[in-house]
From Swiss-Prot:
Keywords: Cell outer membrane, Ion transport, Membrane, Porin, Transmembrane, Transmembrane beta strand, Transport. GO terms for biological process: monoatomic ion transport. One of its GO terms (cellular component) is pore complex. GO terms for molecular function: porin activity. Disulfide bonds: none annotated. It is found in: Cell outer membrane. This is 39 kDa major outer membrane protein.
């Protein structure tokens, strides 16, 4: 997935990757 911001709130597949 491609993270558009440093907070990981918006990814390409919409996956919850809020591990920052």
């Amino acid at each position: 997935v491609k993270v558009y911001n440093q907070f990981g709130t918006k990814v390409e597949l919409g996956v919850s990757m809020r591990i920052f």
